[in-house]
């Protein structure tokens, strides 16, 4: 018998897209699902849309938060009430292919995977274009070791490193959420969290296929104007990630290079915004000095 799968959808003011999003979930070829819509204090008509879907289909459950708590809190709330053996997360402005859950779950059945990772393509509202990372000849199904996963998360990889960082288009065994929660109150919560599921998983399978449409919106949180908290958050997130991987006995050399490249980018951004007198700027400069001093000692500069 097929297992129940919980689909958690965090929602904030996405009424413009929400109907299309939920309709595509309801049309999944894998039907043994529950859909948990978490209205994170929306001020548009998102809450009403959620309630209407709940009245139409008994697989839909709705949670309303009175005040906006953030995407991470909304995800955690939905996960906390999920009844499924596996959980997948869908952003409320995105679209899932009708066979996504079936395709991911097939690998659970065939390979007894704790985590199954898909891939996605982009629709950019600013230019009206679709961007694909996977073509026909790129399709593959791979069982991946944790070291390879972390290298692909961090590296300039031939597929799409974001596929391993975003929490969407995946199936994750529910029991892993007993140990891992999304980090609320800062940006890059996905970057801070997803590697922990991989570190705990006994088996991870990757399907390199376009299973999910990710919508890039001009008003989304990751496309808004830079502020100083971005620099604080990225340093905190990568410090945590590197620490976790060191404790797990992994080689962090690829992750270290990615961290340094991000520090360089943020150093330039802070200089552009004339924020060189800040503690954040000084901290980034200190960390870069540690890296370049080590490279010089090792004869790599």
UniProtKB/Swiss-Prot annotation:
Gene, per the UniProt record: glyG
Gene3D superfamilies linked: Spore Coat Polysaccharide Biosynthesis Protein SpsA, Chain A (3.90.550.10)
Keywords: Glycosyltransferase, Transferase
GO BP annotations, alphabetical order: protein glycosylation
Pathway assigned to this chain's UniProt record: Protein modification; protein glycosylation
Name of the protein in question: Glycosyltransferase GlyG
UniProt key word Glycosyltransferase: yes
Annotated function: Involved in the polymorphic O-glycosylation of the serine-rich repeat protein PsrP. Catalyzes the third step in glycosylation PsrP in this bacteria. Transfers glucose from UDP-glucose to the terminal glucose moiety of already-glycosylated PsrP (using truncated substrates with PsrP SSR1-GlcNAc-Glc). Has a marked preference for PsrP substrate that has already been modified by GlcNAc and glucose. In vitro has hydrolytic activity against UDP-glucose and to a lesser extent against UDP-galactose.
GO terms for MF: glycosyltransferase activity
InterPro entries according to UniProt: Glyco_trans_2-like, Nucleotide-diphossugar_trans
Note: Encoded in RD10, a pathogenicity island with an atypical GC content that is associated with invasive pneumococcal disease. Pathogenicity islands account for greater than half the genomic diversity observed between isolates. The main function of this island seems to be correct synthesis and export of pneumococcal serine-rich repeat protein PsrP.
Similarity comment text for this entry: Belongs to the glycosyltransferase 2 family.
Annotated CDD domains: Glyco_tranf_GTA_type
Coiled-coil segments on the chain, per record: none
Pfam families, per the entry: Glycos_transf_2
């Amino acid at each position: 018998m097929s297992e129940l799968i919980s689909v958690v959808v965090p929602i904030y003011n996405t009424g413009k897209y929400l109907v299309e999003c939920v309709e595509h979930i309801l049309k999944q070829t894998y039907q043994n699902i529950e859909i948990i819509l978490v209205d994170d204090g929306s001020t548009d008509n998102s809450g009403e849309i959620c309630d209407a879907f709940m009245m139409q289909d008994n697989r839909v459950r709705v949670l309303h938060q009175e005040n906006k708590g953030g995407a991470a809190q909304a995800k955690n709330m939905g996960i906390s009430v999920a009844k499924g053996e596996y959980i997948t997360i869908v952003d409320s402005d995105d679209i899932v292919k009708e066979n996504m859950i079936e395709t991911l779950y097939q690998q659970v059945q065939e390979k007894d995977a704790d985590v199954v990772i898909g891939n996605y393509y982009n629709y950019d509202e600013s230019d009206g274009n679709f961007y694909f990372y996977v073509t026909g000849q790129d399709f593959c199904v791979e069982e991946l070791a944790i070291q390879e996963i972390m290298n692909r998360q961090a590296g300039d990889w031939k597929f799409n490193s974001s596929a391993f960082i975003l929490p969407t288009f995946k199936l994750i065994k529910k029991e892993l959420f007993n140990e891992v929660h999304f980090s609320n109150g800062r940006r890059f919560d996905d970057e801070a969290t997803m590697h922990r599921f991989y570190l705990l998983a006994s088996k991870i399978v990757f399907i390199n296929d376009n299973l999910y449409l990710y919508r890039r919106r001009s008003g989304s949180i990751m496309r808004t104007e830079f502020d100083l908290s971005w620099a604080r958050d990225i340093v905190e997130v990568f410090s945590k990630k590197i620490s976790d991987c060191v404790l797990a006995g992994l080689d962090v050399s690829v992750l270290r290079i990615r961290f340094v490249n991000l520090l360089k980018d943020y150093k330039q951004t802070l200089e552009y915004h004339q924020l060189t007198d800040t503690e954040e700027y000084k901290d980034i400069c200190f960390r870069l000095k540690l890296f370049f001093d080590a490279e010089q000692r090792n004869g790599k500069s």
